[in-house]
């Protein structure tokens, strides 16, 4: 009889083991729905900036109210958590926001200011931002001054990309952003990243130094390049509260001039002081003896070539900047950690593999409006945690407000 009981127990154990299956691969942890028109593969490295959404707007209508949104950069600290700043301000569409940073733990955090200050990342991957918000400046075509003192601008009105501050990452993977937000084309301060991956940003906004040439003219570039963000050990992303503006230069006669964006056609000046721009963005205009500036007749196809790029903001990249890549719907940071929505609905970077109990680790995309999305959702929530906001994909409490995570290209400055 005892022998029969042993056989039965063995049979039951075998059946139980046969029914057990290991957890599914993390790359399959993806939402069932996808964002219409979303890009799941992006060719270049990019960062993110936190753009608050009006609390009276629904998630479905949020994309149509971009012009009334205040933008702040998110930061990431080392543990991979993503956090945002605590104050918001209305800015124009595509206004420049501070880039977010990441610390070591991968957490993403944003500061309480919505200035365009760059964000940093600490070791845990958390992303954090500063607490202040400021209005951003819109970037217009650079103007030049001729010998008679007249100030003229080019004839082409190209739509340059707005410059946002780069974000940084700390060791834990948390992402944090600065507390101030700038309008389009404003330059944000660079952010750093610590070991845990958290990203955090500073709280002040500062303009880049200007230069002066012999005649006293002051010149500045037309692109407001934002400082890149840094990352600390835990992966958290944090951003500084300062925003750095593009430096301007001054020439000998005291006139102040700004450089043109690389996407805009170069303009030339002729003897009579008139300034003319070429119709082809890749061709420079010529100058004749009477001072008139003339442009080439070829039409530019550059706008059409870049029209499919959903990202229209740029930021300077520095050491520790929160650098993200999107391939096949999988989001990774500069340390190769996986961007995921963890069990408490927080957005952070971990692994690989992602944190145990992660809900989503794939299914990321960039929407046609240039916002980061998970599945068919591009609305995230910044929830106050001390002096920073953590970022979540769902509303989890009264201290949470909806935001968009705007993608920003990172460039070497």
From Swiss-Prot:
PIR1/2/3 repeat residue intervals:
73-89, 97-115, 116-134, 140-158, 164-182, 188-206, 207-225, 226-244, 245-263, 264-282, 283-300
Q: What induces it?
A: Positively regulated by signaling through MPK1 in response to cell wall perturbation. Induced by heat shock and nitrogen starvation. Expression is also regulated by the ACE2 and SWI5 transcription factors.
- On whether Transferase is a keyword of this UniProt record, the answer is no
Q: Where is the signal peptide?
A: 1-18
Any one GO CC term of the record: cellular bud scar
| Impact reported for residue 297 to S | In strain: B1, TD04/1a and TD04/1b
Q: How is it modified after translation?
A: Covalently linked to beta-1,3-glucan of the inner cell wall layer via an alkali-sensitive ester linkage between the gamma-carboxyl group of glutamic acids, arising from specific glutamines within the PIR1/2/3 repeats, and hydroxyl groups of glucoses of beta-1,3-glucan chains.
- Propeptide regions on this chain: 19-72
Which superkingdom, per the lineage? Answer: Eukaryota
Q: By its UniProt entry, which PROSITE patterns does this protein fall under?
A: PIR_REPEAT_1, PIR_REPEAT_2
What the record says about its domains? Answer: The PIR1/2/3 repeats are required for the covalent linkage to the cell wall. Their number varies among different strains of S.cerevisiae.
- State any further remark: Present with 14600 molecules/cell in log phase SD medium.
> Its function?
Component of the outer cell wall layer. Required for stability of the cell wall and for optimal growth. Required for resistance against several antifungal and cell wall-perturbing agents and for tolerance to heat shock.
The name of this protein is: Cell wall mannoprotein HSP150
Name the species this protein comes from: Saccharomyces cerevisiae (strain ATCC 204508 / S288c) (Baker's yeast)
Q: What is the lineage of its organism?
A: Eukaryota, Fungi, Dikarya, Ascomycota, Saccharomycotina
Q: What gene does the UniProt entry assign to this protein? A: HSP150
């Amino acid at each position: 009889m005892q022998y029969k009981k042993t056989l039965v127990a063995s049979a039951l154990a075998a059946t139980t083991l046969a029914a057990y299956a290991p957890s599914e691969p993390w790359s399959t942890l993806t939402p069932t729905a996808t964002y219409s028109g979303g890009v799941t593969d992006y060719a270049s490295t990019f960062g993110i900036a936190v753009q608050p959404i009006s609390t009276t707007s629904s998630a479905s209508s949020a994309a149509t109210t971009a012009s009334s949104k205040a933008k702040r950069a998110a930061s990431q600290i080392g543990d991979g958590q993503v956090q945002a700043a605590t104050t918001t301000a209305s800015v124009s569409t595509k206004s420049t926001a501070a880039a977010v940073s990441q610390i070591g733990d991968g957490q993403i955090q944003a500061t309480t200011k919505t200035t365009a200050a760059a964000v940093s990342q600490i070791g845990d991957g958390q992303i954090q931002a500063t607490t202040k918000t400021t209005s951003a400046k819109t970037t217009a075509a650079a103007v030049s001054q001729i010998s008679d003192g007249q100030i003229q601008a080019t004839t082409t009105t190209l739509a340059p990309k707005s410059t946002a501050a780069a974000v940084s990452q700390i060791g834990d993977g948390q992402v944090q952003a600065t507390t101030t937000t700038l309008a389009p084309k404003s330059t944000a301060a660079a952010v750093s990243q610590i070991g845990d991956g958290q990203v955090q940003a500073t709280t002040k906004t500062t303009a880049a130094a200007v230069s002066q040439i012999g005649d006293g003219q002051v010149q500045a570039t037309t692109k407001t390049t934002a400082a890149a963000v840094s990352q600390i050990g835990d992966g958290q992303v944090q951003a500084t509260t300062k925003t750095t503006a593009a430096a301007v230069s001054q020439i000998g006669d005291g006139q102040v001039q700004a450089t043109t964006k690389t996407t805009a056609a170069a303009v030339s000046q002729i003897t009579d002081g008139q300034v003319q721009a070429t119709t082809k963005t890749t061709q420079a205009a010529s100058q004749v003896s009477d001072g008139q500036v003339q442009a080439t007749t070829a039409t530019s196809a550059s706008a059409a070539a870049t029209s499919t790029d959903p990202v229209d903001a740029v930021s300077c990249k520095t050491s520790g900047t929160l650098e993200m890549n999107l391939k096949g719907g999988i989001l990774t940071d500069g340390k190769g950690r996986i961007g995921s929505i963890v069990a408490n609905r927080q957005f952070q970077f971990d692994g690989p593999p992602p944190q145990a109990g992660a809900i989503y680790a794939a299914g990321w995309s960039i929407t046609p409006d240039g916002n980061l999305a998970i599945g068919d959702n591009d609305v995230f929530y910044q929830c106050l945690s001390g002096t920073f906001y953590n970022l979540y994909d769902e509303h989890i409490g009264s201290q949470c407000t909806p935001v968009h995570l705007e993608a920003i290209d990172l460039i070497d400055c």
